[in-house]
């Protein structure tokens, strides 16, 4: 088992996609922070209206990195970090790499060769999950560093604006990013199609699923008369809704939801490699 994890980590580090995705993520993040610089130069009323529109729409379709810099609420580096992670911008790159890393073995025949040499085929999925968790950790650290560096360049004298709560926020977002990567890994293993898996990943990251969620929410609210919102029990929903200073109930819900989806994704992937010819 440990040998399989070490092998996947080594192969991951040697792939071009590993470096290509990380470099693309960093460049896109720097560009995004530079664009928020332009947003903050808008009049205060325009910034406030834009922020309110996203808040009212809640989980909107698309990716929006919106910050507010006014005299009453001066922009901090923590605001930039929150805006980027809650938008699921880094998640797109994490999911793209998850697809490329998971499907590549089926195309090259590597998994067929190594599959007969391991005691249990499920170890192949667990090792890939471990490698993707490491990649998500690296992406989280690099994303945060890129945001901080770009913020200090674009906004000279900007304050961090957060301490211990930022570390907790990033830790939970790392867990949820790993859960999303494992979900996409399961799709890739089940379909063995890069096109299908990337399409699912993009749809999840830009919130296409909210069309279905909104209908389900209305149906439950009509039957139970309760203010129910299923998005708060999904990984993508919690990535968006998690506040910078989360309460204990928010942390518990996010961690439990991520754990359930991670277990389900691993189970689906393991079942796929056991029942199908690899």
Give residue spans per PLM region:
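Aromatic- and glycine-rich beta-strand/loop motifs that create alpha-glucan
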Residues: 1-26
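Junction motif at the cytosolic side of a transmembrane helix
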Residues: 11, 260-278
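Secretory targeting signals
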Residues: 18, 22-101, 125-192, 201, ...
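Transmembrane helix boundary and interhelical loop/hinge segments in multi-pass membrane proteins
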Residues: 98-117, 121-122, 129
